[in-house]
Amino acid sequence: MKTLLINCAAALCLLLTGCDAGQAREETIPAPLTGIDHLADHLSVQEFWVNGTSGHQAGGGGSVVCCVKLPQQWHSGLTVVVGWGVTNWRDCTWESHERRVPVERYDEVGSLYVHFLSDGRVRVVSSNISPGYSNEDYAGPHDPIPSKTPYEKYGTWSPRCPVGAKPVLTESLDE
């Protein structure tokens, strides 16, 4: 009886490892995360995240958070889930977004730049070249990155805007 149990346990182990052996594990590398806000002066991306990792506030590209994981090798169909909140300082509103976004082709893993473009698109670029200062070698968008301080132009959020308001859920992967 004891031999039968040992043989059954051994067979079960072989079956379980056999199932896993056919599935190649994707090797990932940590990549610094930066958000770039290309929105109008009265709008700002106050918070964003990629695959659950917070990038905090998007700005001109100088703030870096560690880290998101990217596959060492880019492959067709590679996407990340990007979530973000947009504050409208002029109209006292804010929106919440979540979208699956393709990661643009890369040869080697670099910093992950998330571009929030003025036309509503989001582009995700992994690059070892910074997008700042009109760097022509950067593979991502070259849209203007406005220097802005909406709280100075429109005033602080409180007491001008309602406290405790819920965001308008503009888009969600759950929909």
Predicted regions and their residues:
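Bacterial N-terminal signal peptides that target proteins for export
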Residues: 1-9
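Structural motif
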Residues: 33-42
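C-terminal motif of bacterial Sec signal peptides marking the signal peptidase cleavage site
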Residues: 15-18
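Short coil/turn motif common to extracellular beta-sandwich-like domains
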Residues: 26-33
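Tryptophan-paired
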Residues: 46-91
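Bacterial signal peptide processing site
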Residues: 20-22
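Surface-exposed coil/turn segments at beta-strand junctions on protein surfaces, enriched
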Residues: 26, 73-75, 105-107
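Beta-strand-rich cores of mature extracytoplasmic or soluble domains
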Residues: 86-175
